[in-house]
Structure formats: C-alpha cells, structure tokens
Amino acid sequence: MTRGPQPLMAIHGAQEIASRRGVVLDKPVLKGSHYDFILFTAGCTVFVRVKRIRTHVSNPQEISSLFCEDVQQIRRIPKTAVISREIWVLSPWKTWQYFEIFDDRIVEIRYDGQAVLQEEKVPG
C-alpha cells in the first residue's frame, strides 16, 4: 500500500541529477515497477526508487523502517557486480540523500554512487 501520490517533481529532479552520472531510462513501460527509472553508467546499471521524506536520515537503517515495502520490492531486483539498487530521498529543504540497497544492509552513498566515508575509530 502506498502513502500518497507518486513524487513526480522529486522524480524529475532525481533524473536531472542522474543524467550527470550517465544515461537515464524513463519510459511509460516502467510505470508500476519497483523503481522509478534506470540509470546506465560505465560498467553498472542502477535501478532507482525516489521517495520524499520529512526529516534528514541520520542512520541508513532508518530507510528500512521508513520505506519497508519499497526496500523489499527493490531487493527483488538481483544484485550483482554490475547491478545496483538505490533509494534516493528528498527532504522538504530540497536536500538529497542516496542509499544503496544490499541484500543484508543499506549503505549511504554520494550522488555519484560512491560510498560515504564512515568515521574510523582510532585506538586508544
């Protein structure tokens, strides 16, 4: 069950960002699928789901609880070395956050698909 209408303006904005990364496929044939568009980059095909959010996500695992159904649906797409599954979220302040969906975890990434650096604990 969905909560509200599809975020068409957010999807359009996401496609503009994605076009800087590669070629975007957005066809009526994709309507009703588990993703909003497909992004073709050098060596990788990215399936992207776009969502709106009311707050900043401080922990990638929040995506799993906020968008449980979307995460489950996008995980149906096989994850391989050349296929990526991502959820992009837009806040009311027009800031984007990007998350790569693995089978066992969710990782925050940058707009270019690279992982956000995590803080390292320095011993002692």
Predicted segments with their positions:
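Acidic-basic catalytic patches of nuclease active cores, encompassing PD-(D/E)XK
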Residues: M1-P28
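Conserved catalytic cores of phosphodiester-cleaving nucleases, focusing on short active-site segments
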Residues: A18, F37-L39, G43-N59
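Active-site metal-binding core of divalent-cation-utilizing nuclease and nuclease-like domains
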Residues: R20-H34, I38-A42
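Structural signal for conserved beta-strand scaffold positions within catalytic alpha/beta enzyme cores
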Residues: K27, R49, I87-V89
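Short, solvent-exposed coil/turn elements at secondary-structure transition points
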Residues: K31, I53, S91-W93
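Short, charged, amphipathic alpha-helix that recurs within catalytic cores of restriction-modification
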Residues: S58-A81, E86
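Domain-level recognition of nuclease-like catalytic cores that cleave nucleotide substrates
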Residues: A81-G124
